[in-house]
């Protein structure tokens, strides 16, 4: 199978990146040292090519009403242009089709950023719901492989770390209006060399920073200028350890179409209180929460916490969904779906290679803004 490539593929290879198949995309896992890349994001600034993710623009007078029924979170929270919201998109059974970010720019102009592996299915689902509801929303994917004729393909570079914003401003003075942005807000600026840049104060690392949505034809220039400014290229390996430390779910690993957001630690993104109806609401209300989604820290030596390992508790068995060795904590950490009777602070047993090793149940996240929140 031929892998898809982002517009930065040649640059990754020129930098000596180790490339892997990530959901059908040829992506860099690291550029030599995953731990150094991780630490650069925690202490300074690193950048990630996330152009495999897909921007989807939604336009039309009924866009807000359409999204009110499409998403589990309530887009009525979005009243200020540029404001963003994290949400799940559910099927009728309450399973997670995808988790995404929705941006509001005007009543007839919203933007979604969806995951790479689910993008084609997401677009098909959104179009089907649009047809079924007669909303008349114009749906325009902006990733190169799915953008329609006449739509400028877009790419995304995430610049993350305590010094990320300053380095972006110094490299691209046109982005200075983003200085006033609060987290989960975006602004669109025009750069004379790059063109239109959407600067979003969002990310997937637990650090401050920006996600820059730029014309795909100019993303190489963005990357090279940031590289010259001392922003360290970082791959999927560091991205995974950073997001795990930050307590951020990965679609396909921590939740999927067979998982309720209530069982994946995402109840805070689901609006069950208002009278608004949305796809999957009735199923969620009927099922309720059946499992907890909590963190684990391995206490015994002799293993690393990994996905699918069994967790033995006094309240019954659970399962790890994501696990890794944390560079920031120098400990093995994990997310786990656990029975409702388990409490933070409990000691549980994790089955690792025919051994049972002790782990402590903790509240997520493990690390945020460079500071350990657990011990």
Curated annotation (Swiss-Prot):
It comes from the Bacteria. One of its GO terms (molecular function) is aminomethyltransferase activity. Its EC number is 2.1.2.10. It holds the Pfam family GCV_T_C. The glycine cleavage system catalyzes the degradation of glycine. The glycine cleavage system is composed of four proteins: P, T, L and H. This is Aminomethyltransferase. The lineage of its organism: Bacteria, Pseudomonadati, Pseudomonadota, Betaproteobacteria, Burkholderiales. The gene is gcvT.
């Amino acid at each position: 199978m031929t892998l898809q490539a982002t517009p930065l593929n040649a640059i990754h290879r020129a930098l000596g990146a180790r490339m892997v198949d990530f959901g059908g995309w040829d992506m860099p896992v690291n550029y030599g040292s995953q731990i150094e890349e991780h630490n650069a994001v925690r202490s300074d600034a690193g950048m990630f090519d996330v152009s495999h993710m897909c921007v989807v623009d939604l336009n039309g007078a009924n866009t807000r009403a359409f999204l009110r029924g499409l998403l589990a979170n309530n887009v009525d929270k979005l009243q200020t242009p540029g404001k963003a919201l994290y949400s799940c998109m559910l099927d009728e059974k309450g399973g997670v089709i995808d988790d995404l970010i929705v941006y509001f720019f005007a009543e007839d102009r919203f933007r979604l950023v969806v995951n790479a592996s689910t993008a084609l299915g997401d677009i098909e689902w959104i179009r089907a719901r649009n047809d079924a509801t007669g909303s008349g929303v114009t749906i325009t994917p902006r990733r190169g492989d799915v953008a329609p004729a006449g739509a400028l393909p877009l790419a995304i570079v995430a610049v993350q770390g305590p010094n990320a914003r300053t380095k972006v401003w110094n490299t691209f003075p046109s982005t200075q209006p983003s200085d006033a942005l609060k987290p989960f807000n975006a602004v669109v600026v025009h750069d004379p060399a790059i063109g239109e840049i959407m600067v979003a104060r969002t990310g997937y690392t637990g650090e401050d920073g920006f996600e820059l949505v730029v014309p795909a034809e100019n993303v190489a220039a963005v990357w090279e200028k940031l590289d010259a400014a001392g922003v360290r290229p970082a791959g999927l390996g560091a991205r995974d350890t950073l997001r795990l430390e930050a307590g951020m779910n990965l679609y396909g690993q921590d939740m999927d179409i067979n998982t309720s957001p209530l069982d994946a630690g995402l109840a805070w993104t689901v609006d069950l209180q208002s009278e608004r109806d949305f796809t999957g609401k009735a199923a969620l209300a009927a099922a309720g929460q059946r499992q907890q989604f909590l963190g684990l820290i391995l206490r015994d030596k002799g293993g690393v916490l990994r996905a699918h390992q069994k967790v033995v508790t006094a309240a019954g068995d659970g399962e790890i969904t994501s696990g890794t060795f944390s560079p920031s904590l120098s400990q093995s950490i994990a997310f786990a779906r656990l029975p409702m009777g388990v409490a933070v602070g409990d000691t549980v047993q994790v089955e690792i290679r025919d051994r049972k090793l002790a782990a402590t149940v903790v509240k997520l996240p493990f690390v945020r803004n460079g500071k350990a929140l657990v011990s």
